[in-house]
Amino acid sequence: MILYEYPFNERIRTLLRLEDLFERFAFFLAQEDPREHHVALTTLFEIAEVTGRADLKSDLMKELERQRQTLAPFRGNPGIEQNALEAVLGEIEQTLANLAQMQGKTGQHLVDNEWLASIRSRAVIPGGTCKFDLPSYYAWQQWPAEQRRQDIAKWILPMLPLRDAVTIVLRLARESGQASKVMAMQGSYQQMLSGRTYQLMQVRVPPELRVIPEASANKYMLWVRFTVQDGDVRPRAVDIDVPFHLTLCNL
């Protein structure tokens, strides 16, 4: 099944973007080629842009604290797997402690590093990081891969508590949902929400159908419409019945 996720609010939208950026960063950092480490570095700059929001850290801390207070009363409950509960609570408490130790504006260390700031300003220009533009950066790219990797890992280090917090919040949100099998009649599906508030919708479709879900929602109803794309033609609505799995997640 192919998984599509749709955030219902700006906070979850930001967390999903950060998750995607951190995953891309980790992938390219693990590679060996200087061009792949260039992508890791520019992704680091993107992470800094998104995490630079003044309220992101406080929002994550409030959500983790809320989850901690929700889960803590289940300690000693015979109906709850205690080892799993303690693992989650320990992870939350450690991440809260790490977030509390973060000082100043997120990503400020990248701004204060004049060399990185010069690369960052050139990276937004198409082809702006050529060797004749940034010879010192080109020289750094000739260093051994492990040395470059250590440098980039050092630069991401102050942001890792945010990554851990994002991972926990999204995992708890996803685990809160229960998948149901539904059918989009003639490619269209709608469902009343009965006033319940959700943060995230997951749509899983069989890959062999080659359909693309488009979703929207308000506090009363959600809609899923399936489209198909042929070659370079823009997606068009399908008129066949589409079976899929729908999950609504609520922290």
From Swiss-Prot:
Which NCBIfam families does this entry report, sorted A to Z?
PRK05287.1-4
Superkingdom of the organism of origin = Bacteria
Gene that encodes the chain: zapD
State its location(s).
Cytoplasm
This entry carries the following GO cellular component terms, namely: cell division site; cytoplasm
Name the Gene Ontology biological process terms.
division septum assembly; FtsZ-dependent cytokinesis
Question: Main localisation, per the record?
Answer: cytoplasm
The entry sums up its family as follows:
Belongs to the ZapD family.
The answer to whether the entry has keyword GTP-binding is no
Does the record bear Cytoplasm in its keywords?
yes
Record keywords: Cell cycle, Cell division, Cytoplasm, Septation
Give the multimer and partner information: Interacts with FtsZ.
Q: What is this protein called?
A: Cell division protein ZapD
Q: What does this protein do?
A: Cell division factor that enhances FtsZ-ring assembly. Directly interacts with FtsZ and promotes bundling of FtsZ protofilaments, with a reduction in FtsZ GTPase activity.
